Curated annotation (Swiss-Prot):
Disulfide bonds: none annotated. Its cofactor is Cu(2+); Zn(2+). This is Purine nucleoside phosphorylase HI_0175. Pfam families: Cu-oxidase_4. Purine nucleoside enzyme that catalyzes the phosphorolysis of adenosine and inosine nucleosides, yielding D-ribose 1-phosphate and the respective free bases, adenine and hypoxanthine. Also catalyzes the phosphorolysis of S-methyl-5'-thioadenosine into adenine and S-methyl-5-thio-alpha-D-ribose 1-phosphate. Also has adenosine deaminase activity. Its EC number is 2.4.2.1, 3.5.4.4, 2.4.2.28. PANTHER family: PURINE NUCLEOSIDE PHOSPHORYLASE LACC1, UNCHARACTERIZED PROTEIN YFIH. It catalyses: adenosine + phosphate = alpha-D-ribose 1-phosphate + adenine; S-methyl-5'-thioadenosine + phosphate = 5-(methylsulfanyl)-alpha-D-ribose 1-phosphate + adenine; inosine + phosphate = alpha-D-ribose 1-phosphate + hypoxanthine; adenosine + H2O + H(+) = inosine + NH4(+).
Amino acid sequence: MQAINPNWNVPKNIHAFTTTREGGVSLAPYLSFNLGDHVGDNKSAVKTNRTLLVEKFGLPQTPIFLTQTHSTRVIQLPYSGQNLEADAVYTNVPNQVCVVMTADCLPVLFTTTSGNEVAATHAGWRGLCDGVLEETVKYFQAKPEDIIAWFGPAIGPKAFQVGIDVVEKFVVVDEKAKLAFQPDAIEEGKYLSNLYQIATQRLNNLGITQIYGGNHCTFNEKEKFFSYRRDNQTGRMASVIWFE
């Protein structure tokens, strides 16, 4: 069972990774380590996969799985409420596991140079545009220069085609965003979007410059990752972080 481990410089008490599609029990089209229970997969298979997630990767607890809605809502752990509709999760308590699920959208994991705060954010283009990264960072006590971010596997800039409407939504918020869109050479009126670049711009605007990752493409790495845009009916990876 493999995982993608961040290539970042963080304290040794930080545990973080993104799962791949390999090593689970789900059948096609969710082959095989699908962790999403909202995508049409067999519920028993998903339950087994979630148990494997805890056991194989040494999680200190069974995590809360958010009901992700492309919002900017953040939940702070430990959380005793009933409303799990959110797209980011933060904690400053040891062994509280933060998890988001993705299959093209950008997962961003956060920690600090002191290693006593962590967060996980699901940044689809809507949430990214609306400010889900900014809302996550608001929870941190650390100064921006002490916050560290890692971009997990997302759809890459050669595969994420959007219309002019999406371009305009981003540019209204930050004019620099236009640098992250290139006209599609094949289809007129369409653009190729770089989520990693936009997320970097947004974090830089907050004063966060310690940024890692952003070197995978879920769409093109079919053997390793689920991709909603490629397959439509598919599973979800998990991006996970906690501190001891």
